[in-house]
A protein has these predicted regions:
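Carboxylate-rich, polar loop motifs that coordinate divalent cations or form catalytic acidic clusters
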Residues: 1-363
């Protein structure tokens, strides 16, 4: 797709020229995309479960994998270490992993928050809350989004190191079921909402007030799973109806007719080579500012539904999948741009001991 095909929402200012300038500024088009070699990690390689909800690399280069049903796995020096309820996790359904400035690992689960400090699992608070996403702001305050409002109340929580503050619709939070929490370069906190699949749009908190955006303002769909800020300060939102781009004034939309492989966008990333990657229900789409390239199971992915993306410090991209079948799924890994010896480098990460038996599916 050429950026001139960006489609503005009706009744919004046409800002195509500025978006074209944006893409030229920090994205570089590929004339001939190089073929990619995909590798995979599954329960056969030591993962405790194939349903992957989050992947995170910490400051020590360890890779943490949150699974839905198998707990938390950590890949350190080529060996897997698994944490689950037997080790003190509140739940084996792990939804988000982050690291604080002290090097502690915070783990959001479907039943509360844990902290892993020097290998010891500790209680992190919010017991009984069904947590889905979290982030640290510039002040090292932790923002945690809750969903399943009918079970655990929902809402947004902020921990300043001593006390918790809660935000609900009474404080003008757009909804009670929070799918995504993000802090931008200005320190503002953004949330994406679910609301039983209908969504309530996105909210932006500047420390004092909430400003909310829905389809009435130009968002393509009110159910928002993912977001990022690009190098020019534009906000990108992944919804179940496509992508929305907000430059602070105007809204623009990208959908399947523009080149996305699927309109349900669960995760997104700008890599170190200035390429955009989008994980969807139907595979992965890569955008270089002009052209879309998509990858599915036919190209080597372990599963089409991609729930999370990270780029590790060695330049490899990890895609965590969340299939509808417990026998499918796992992690797909690719070197981009392609480099030689990827299979050898991947094998160096895998544990030498025999992998555990396949675990029974989670809920």
């Amino acid at each position: 797709m050429n950026s001139k095909d960006l489609i503005p929402q009706p009744a919004r200012d046409d800002n195509h020229s500025s978006l074209r300038a944006l893409f030229r500024q920090y994205l570089q088009s590929e004339q001939t995309p190089a073929p990619l070699t995909w590798e995979s990690l599954t329960t056969r390689d030591g993962l405790p479960h194939n349903w992957i909800y989050d992947i995170f690399q910490d400051s020590s280069s360890r890779v943490w994998v949150g699974t839905w049903g198998g707990g938390l796995a950590c890949l350190d020096s080529g060996k897997w270490k698994v944490f689950n309820k037997n080790h003190g996790l509140h739940s084996n359904e792990v939804t988000c992993i982050r690291e604080d400035k002290l090097g502690r690992i915070w783990v959001a689960t479907d039943n509360g928050l844990n902290i892993i400090d020097d290998g010891i699992v500790k209680n992190g608070g919010l017991a009984g809350k069904s947590l889905l996403n979290m982030t640290f702001d510039v002040h090292n305050h932790l923002w945690v989004g809750c969903w399943r409002a009918n079970i655990s109340g929902g809402g947004l929580f902020c921990y300043d190191g001593s006390n918790w503050t809660s935000y609900t619709t009474r404080q003008n939070l757009p909804g009670l079921e929070i799918l995504k929490v993000f802090t931008d370069s200005s320190g503002r906190v953004w949330v994406g909402t679910y609301e039983q699949g209908y969504g309530a749009g996105v909210g932006c908190f500047d420390g004092q007030n909430w400003v909310n955006y829905t389809t009435q303002q130009g968002l393509v769909n009110d159910c928002v799973y993912s977001m990022f800020e690009d190098p020019s300060g534009n906000m990108w939102f992944g919804t179940i109806g496509g992508l929305s781009i907000f430059d602070g004034r105007s809204w623009h939309t990208l959908t399947r007719r523009d080149g996305l492989v699927n309109d349900q966008v669960f995760c997104m990333l700008i890599d170190s080579h200035k390429k955009m990657w989008f994980g969807t229900e139907g595979g992965i789409s890569r955008f270089d500012g002009e052209k879309w390239i998509s990858y599915t199971r036919k190209d080597g992915l372990v599963e089409n539904l991609v729930r999370t993306i990270i780029e590790t410090s060695d330049g490899r991209l990890w895609f965590g999948t969340y299939p509808y079948s417990p026998q499918a799924g796992g992690i797909s890994i690719v070197q981009y741009p392609p480099e030689k010896s990827l299979p050898d480098r991947l094998l160096d990460l895998l544990p030498d001991s025999p992998p555990p038996k396949h675990l029974p599916p989670g809920k």
